[in-house]
Amino acid sequence: MWKIPRDFFSFFKKTSARVNIFPRSAPALLTRTGKKSYDDICAGTAGREKGFCIMKEKLSARDYVSVASMLFGLFFGAGNLIFPVHMGQMAGANLWPAIAGFCITGVGLPLLGVAALGLSRSSGLFDLSSKVGRPYAYFFTCLLYLTIGPFFAIPRCANTSFTVGLEQILPQDGNMKLWLFLFTLAFFIAALLFSLYPGKILTWVGKILNPLFLLFLGILVAVSLLNPTAHMSQVAPQGDYVSQPFFTGFLDGYNTMDALASLAFGIIVVQVIRGLGVEEPGAVARCTAKSGVFSCLLMAVIYLAVAVVGVQSRGVLETSENGGIALAQIARYYLGTPGLLVLAATVTLACLKTAIGLITSCAETFAAIFPHGPKYSAWAVIFSGVSLLFANFGLSAIIQYSIPVLMFLYPLAIMLPLLALCGKLFGHDRRVYGWTLGFTLAAALLDALFALPAGMQSLFHAGAIQKVVLRILPFSGLGLGWICPALVGLCIGLALHFCGKKPA
């Protein structure tokens, strides 16, 4: 999913736009310049004018390709493929509106987050969310990192590896939970060791792994498309995909968590673009958007192809409990046991690399925003232990319990970059941020409540509350009840900005 360099979080602190460390995730760009820092590049061919680089308005074609490749590598990962394949099995004949909704949240919103970081000149997520207030910045930053870290995304990496690989070749007896524990224990010991003692082997694995995985995926997709077991029109949609395919796909795109990741790690891309000489915020945002067109199109094509494979598998396979099982069953059907083993090994290594990056980045973040708390190594051990605990609940449980949290976080992760992109219109007035996100947060809490598992809903009397909310709040039946409250909060904030007393 996300490749996070350990030295990235030097950007996280409030520094000038010209930081002296480049992310390791852009080695090609550094190799081209032969430099190690932004200042070194500025002192080179461009020269200096009163301590600043001569700024460019746009990148060269070669630079656009480099940044686009970086964006693709930052957001695309093996773990995300379990969602479009399962969506394909569920959506059936209604795949087209479903994949359109999925791509908006799974592809478009991550690009929005990166562009917002570039346009607002923020030095990272904490700086961006501080526009609301420091207490909110601590709350939102911690919750977001815990979500894409030890609570859900990291355990999901281990579980996806187990579900696609070892679970498919082990005897289906009563010892599966023991095997899951042993596998996840080994997985997180390896992830922790690499997080504490990173080496060049990860860079080498990444360079080999991504092309290998894409090649294998291309073979699987090609074989499946050329030998469909069912045509799309013959596959009946299931669940909410029957009546609301677009909005159901839109909400299923939350599961990729890439919009959250864009706010956490998008500053990497922004700093690389600035390092190439594009400094004006609007130009940075434009360059990000242009670079993102290629990466977004590629991700959308991959998601679509995998979703179609999911649909066409329904001729011989039942709808699976989760996408990890579906992907493994499809690989076994078309490519046999050898193909399944190759898929399992590739996915396991890819997910391990993702888990290492996430443990590293979460530990760096918490060590940075809580300087008087535990050190980096202690946070890494804590997050690895928590991830091990949650991983043993199983992949389906992790996905199920992540949904309410994502229903709460995503509206905030949508509105914050939108406000940052439009911030010039209201001078980035904190009142606009506060009122908008305050109303959004309150409504998102209701959406999260209604997305809880059935047993927990009865505990909080969610059914009775939902009946009232459905009558008074538009779009709440679609899981988008936050939209109107967000607009109300925005109107109040803008009214205070343009008509009220200016803040001191």
Residue ranges, per PLM feature:
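Hydrophobic, membrane-embedded alpha-helices of multi-pass small-molecule transporters
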Residues: 65-76, 146, 223-230, 239-306, ...
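Selective recognition of specific alpha-helical transmembrane segments in multi-pass small-molecule
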Residues: 104, 108, 112, 212-225, ...
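Membrane-water interface regions at transmembrane-helix termini and the short interhelical loops
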Residues: 119-127, 186-209, 275-278, 388-401, ...
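TM-loop-TM module centered on a large, flexible mid-protein loop between adjacent transmembrane helices
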Residues: 124-130, 302-352, 359, 368, ...
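Hydrophobic alpha-helical segments and their helix-loop junctions in multi-pass secondary transporters
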Residues: 150, 154, 214-241, 259-260, ...
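Membrane-interface loop-to-helix entry segments
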Residues: 196-224, 402-414, 433-443
